[in-house]
Amino acid sequence: MAHLRLQLVVMIIVILAAAAAWGTPAPLSVAFYYADNPPVNELKAFDIVVVDPDHSLNPASYGDGPSRLFAYVSVGEADPQRISTNKMDPAWLIGDNKAWKSRVVDVSNPEWRQFFLDKVVEPLWQAGYRGFFLDTLDSYHLAASKEALPAMQAGLVETIRAIRKRHPEARLILNRGFEIFERIKGDVFAVAAESLFHNFNPATGQYGSVTEEDRQWLLSRLSEVQKSGVPVIAIDYVPPGNRSLTRQTAAKIKALGITPWVSDKALSGLGVGRLEVMPRVILGLYDGAEGDGDAFFTNLQRYAVMPLNYLGYSVKLHDLSTPLPAEILAGRYAGVVVWANSGQSGEKQDLKKWTLRCITEEVPIVFLERFGFPLDSEFAAGLGLELTPFNRLAPPARVVSKDAIFGFEQQPLPNIETFLPMKLKSGTPLLQLASANGITSDAAAITPWGGYVYGKYVLTQLLESQAAWVVDPFRFFKQALRLPDMPIPDTTTENGLRLLLSHVDGDGFESRAEWRGGRLAAEELKNSILDRYKIPVTISLITSSLAPDGLYPKKSAQLEGIARGILALPWVEGASHSFSHPFRWKPDQSDTGIEAESWHTVKVPNYTFNLDAEISGSLNYINERLMPPGKRTRIFQWTGNCLPGEDALRLAYQADALNINGGSTLISTSNLTVTEVAPLGISRGPWFQVFAPNQNENVYTNLWSGNFYGYSRIIETFQLTDSPRRLKPVNIYYHFYSATKEASLNALRRAYDWAMAQPLFSIYTSEYIEKVLDFNRTVIARDDDSWLVRNNGKLRELRIPRESGYPDLTAGSNIAGFTDNNDNRYLHLGPGGEARVRLTSSVPAAPYIETSGAYLDAFERTPAGLQMITRGYVPFEVKIGNGQGCRLITPSAPVLPGASDTTSIKLPEGSHALAVSCQ
């Protein structure tokens, strides 16, 4: 069998060399977006994105990948608003385009051509653009005489050839230019044309339909281009409020074999092309007056975001006291959730009027507890509601009928104080109440525009700090927001196994164990935990505790030596837990009481709090003085209340540091509610704070004041966040001071022992953070009967309901396999950051990875079976579905015959080539 193993190694090398070339290339997809505030993640679904370079998007910020930016360039017209126009010789401007308020250029002028190449194209090339959309190629017809037309056309030909001569690798898309196409077709990447079915007339400001005569003329021109082997693109214009027509128009263009893009008149929205992006962002509107002005403490962030994350959506938080988004909503947002703090929260920014925008653009909107504005009869009627006049409401209120969606964790308890007499005229009622004198209220409903739960029937407060859901948030959000059935990016699992990560906060590093002969906590932790459980672990340090100019200068050499020994362990990655362990990260925070006393800021002599010193300074110290050769830290673990402001987060990102901590996942058998499961994190401006999946021993021991064995209850949290829904990975998270007491150390051992007995996939904390960030970046686009999935390749697991079917495993899908857990089917993606998901009712016959506790660094389907390179940090097992009769071959392990439908192989930690041969 030696020759088989040698052949395997050779084939794996081939896989790695061609890792980016899996599958048959799909037809070209193109998007056009000319406005500010572009939806970057969503645009990356398209192979080519044409942007206005004067706006905020550029190649440097866009990054590498299969999606490329093309720069919009007006050739035949000069826009007075652009800087380059002001530098033009007035003699080059020979007329006006009154409809678009621009000047027509003499494209036959050699001096203009040189200016255009040097001052327009060249700066864009230097900025990183390698593709250009050349617009206004036909504008010379507006100003040139008939006799001048040949010279104008020759000038355009020379200009296009000059671009390619200067930059042979430049890709050019022409907007029309049919009269010159034959002369320059060898220099053209694609040809576009506007208004095949629907147009926009700038003179009248009206959208309209294209006549059949005009359409046939344009189709004949495009057909001539296609015969030359050059792709063609049709750009049509539809009102942004008519998403259905947008979708239908794109489908009609696509059916003609033409690449479509259908959007609004200004190309300022996320339209529909060959692909339709399935938006994965929910806009969450909250009242900035709630939670002492910090969105972290709002009901929206604390309770609604986690279920929306589970359903596959990130949430963009927006304060109702600030101007509401003015950009086109359709295509950008999957829906809107409003959780106002009062009946007047939305009046300042006219939430009522903005709600009508959502309805017009067919973006579902949900209201929780209240609408955020006074609901008058006229507006209620527009929402399909009828307010019932009444003289008085006689208590008590009672439940007349309720859908099974209610009573999720607590039953609804009618309250006459929040009773709003109204009847649903259009939609599906979910909860109907009645007063003692017979007045009714449809307190919750699914409506044509979304849905609402009015009053105290969203959740109920059990105790001062405990809440429970009354409505099932998973089902309600799914139904009310019309969330489509599609693959869901999952941060809890990879290759079918639940993830395991561990990270340690630096508190107590220098403390001494309390038993006789006890050493420093750091030494005890290394001896009792780190050397025993050799799984990936992230160790953070409070640098003022170790530094020569810190708290313990006389002990610094000893403490630094211990830290170096820990960080040198192969399974340890380093992190910073700040310089002085700030309890508060924002100057306006005023935390008091036992938490502030327990999580204090270290008082370092002669030190004044400084964000740079806390973040980049502490990271630099660890890298320069403590990390071994070949290892660097780029992780920052928040301290204290773990509520960094936007400035602190910005500095962490600018230091190229991944960040984690915060959140509050404390679900247990004595606190059995998913309100105690935190979301993935929180957005603060453009920055994202990643929450720890689970909480540390501090909160299981009453802030380290007693019950020091309390961390053993983390096992309850692990179990309850795995079933009936897998909401979190397993995260063993603790402080160095757990090694100072026998009870806490035993609790820690128990948590580790439990984890070691489970089939888990061990990863580093940095890798989990990157998966969460990739969750936010992942774009999913519908392409006929399949979904295109793209991201940075850090998140590689998707989830679908079991009843949705099975993934098509044919070559080109980049789906390595699947496995079932609870009611879901988990799909495992290969490397590369791109996959195509097509579902079928048929069980696959080909072999596939059922589960694996290791990364896939390379993966390919072959006529004989599978080839892959796997890499694990601990010994792991690979299980192959449909493996009966197949052989598993590795260069370092024996050939194992398949004896059942599931064939498996156990491998030591490290990287391994593996082939599955079924012939």
Region roles according to the model:
Residues 33-47, 54, 293-375, 505, ...:
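Helical hinge/lid and interdomain linker segments adjacent to catalytic or ligand-binding clefts
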Residues 95-108, 361, 368, 372-378, ...:
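Metal-dependent polysaccharide deacetylase catalytic core of the NodB/CE4 family, i.e.
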Residues 259-276, 314-321, 480-494, 524, ...:
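C-terminal domain-boundary segment and adjacent tail
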Residues 268, 367, 754, 759-919:
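Non-catalytic C-terminal accessory domains or segments of carbohydrate-active enzymes
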Residues 277-278, 310, 333, 363-364, ...:
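A glycine-centered loop/beta-turn motif at secondary-structure junctions
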